[in-house]
Amino acid sequence: MIAHKYKLIEKINEGSFGTIFKAENIRTKEMVAIKFENKSEQMKSLKNEARIYQYLGNLNGFPQLKTFGTTGNVNYLVMDLLGNSLVNIIKHKELSSNIVLVLGIQIIQRIQSLHNNCLLHRDIKPSNFVFGNKDNTNKLFLIDLGFAKRYDYNGKHIEQKNINHIVGSLNFVSINVHNYIEPSRRDDIESCIYVILTMLFGDLEWFKETDINKIALLKRNIINDDKIPIFIKKMLNYIRSIEFDATPDYDYIISLMIQ
């Protein structure tokens, strides 16, 4: 029993980040998701994620935090139980071009909402966009905020600097992050564009590559690929052109998907 009221039902997912279970509130019968993470100095992403969910409150398109705590040698986070991720949909090739555009707009809207709250996600990938349950089955939610970070402190944008290691999933990080430049809002957007490309085409050319430099080169050159839609090329050209501390023109990016 977790927090004296949550009964574990079944494991949903497991990875280097920890484990996620479906659970039931034995008092209200509400179904929830519980994330577990080994408690150590090296693993503090779950506490960071809980803090950010609490900060975001009832922000549209983000799960609600129920509680955060510790039991034994693990931290746990209780949150809304949501549905399948984009990975499941992409795997079964169930997305028409029109559906991709509808979902693409939601993806940009979610990251805009996060940015409007002075936060970067820094780990954008298909598995971090999930559909809602019940009345929200067509609505995307943005999850896994363990790597999220503030980019603005009291109206002052963080400074551009070099980083020691790549932050995020290698298949989806931006060209700037490949160059070991601190991520900013532009880089979240570039990662979102790669997610949209994955919805359109499935595995991208660089997904089977292991050489970091080759992956970066393939990403850079994708705008020269005749198969890539014009709106994607325009989005990439735009987001790769703006400065580190620039506010992306979200309306322009969305407009490219509704022309």
Q: Where are the language model's segments positioned?
A:
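Protein kinase glycine-rich loop
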Residues: 9-16, 20
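ATP-binding glycine-rich loop module of kinase domains
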Residues: 19, 25-47
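Structural motif at the C-terminus of the N-lobe alphaC helix and the adjacent alphaC-beta4 loop
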Residues: 51-60
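Short beta-strand micro-motifs within the conserved protein kinase catalytic domain, predominantly
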Residues: 64-75
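Structural motif in protein kinase domains
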Residues: 82-91
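Activation segment signature within eukaryotic-like protein kinase domains
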Residues: 103-104
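Catalytic-loop of the protein kinase fold
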Residues: 115-132
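Activation segment/activation loop of eukaryotic-type protein kinase catalytic domains
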Residues: 132-167
